[in-house]
Amino acid sequence: DSDSAHLIG
């Protein structure tokens, strides 16, 4: 994914 949100949190 291009989205980093799933990596942080």
Swiss-Prot record:
Location of Bromohistidine modifications: 6
Domain of life assignment: Eukaryota
Keyword line: Bromination
Role summary: Stimulates sperm respiration and motility.
Name of the featured protein: Sperm-activating peptide SAP-b
Organism: Clypeaster japonicus
